[in-house]
Amino acid sequence: MKLLVLLLCLGLTLVCVHAEEASSMERNFNVEKINGEWYTIMLATDKREKIEEHGSMRVFVEYIHVLENSLALKFHIIINEECSEIFLVADKTEKAGEYSVTYDGSNTFTILKTDYDNYIMIHLINKKDGETFQLMELYGREPDLSSDIKEKFAQLSEEHGIVRENIIDLTNANRCLEARE
């Protein structure tokens, strides 16, 4: 009987933990809760040069502001060894949970997973000059995240066809933290 109660408690705990995660493609997703300060933790792509040093997609998020039908984003990027700011506005598309933004081509993205308080996992498709690549981004509310969340991100990236060699942990890289206001 005690084992049955223990298993029931464990099952309910797993249901509660699972319920806290959300995706922008789900009806229960609350975009307002992603508003605020974020840090780029990891990047993954099927075109590695895009996220290596001096790569155009090696950008470091500072914040996401939720607007009526769009997201205002502030990033930092290192150009000529100096941190520069980039401000972008991503507009909702007609597809549920999808946003589009122009930066180094045409991009559409969705938030695959978030618990709102700790992390966001984003999947982006970039199209430029007839070529397409995908980018996965892991943002955290703090400058670093647990190894469990990082592993969950790596597994999600692999599910999207990105090999481990193309997943970069940026927590020890220059992320322009000194440029944040």
From Swiss-Prot:
Tissue-wise, where is it found?
Answer: Detected in urine of males but absent from female urine (at protein level).
Which region is the signal sequence? 1-19
Look up keyword Signal and say if it applies: yes
Q: Which subcellular locations apply to this protein?
A: Secreted
Gene Ontology BP term (one): olfactory learning
Cystines in this chain: 83-176
**Which keywords, in A-to-Z order, does the entry hold?**
Disulfide bond, Pheromone, Pheromone-binding, Secreted, Signal
Q: Which Pfam families match?
A: Lipocalin (PF00061)
- GO (cellular component) term, any one: extracellular region
One Gene Ontology molecular-function label: pheromone binding
Role summary: Male pheromone which stimulates female sexual attraction to male urinary scent and promotes a strong learned attraction to the airborne urinary odor of an individual male. Promotes spatial learning by rapidly conditioning preference for its remembered location among females and competitor males so that animals prefer to spend time in the site even when scent is absent. In addition to promoting a rapid attraction response, also elicits ultrasonic vocalizations and urinary scent marking in females which do not occur immediately after exposure.
Annotated family? Belongs to the calycin superfamily. Lipocalin family.
Question: What protein am I looking at?
Answer: Major urinary protein 20
Source species: Mus musculus (Mouse)
Q: Which gene encodes it?
A: Mup20
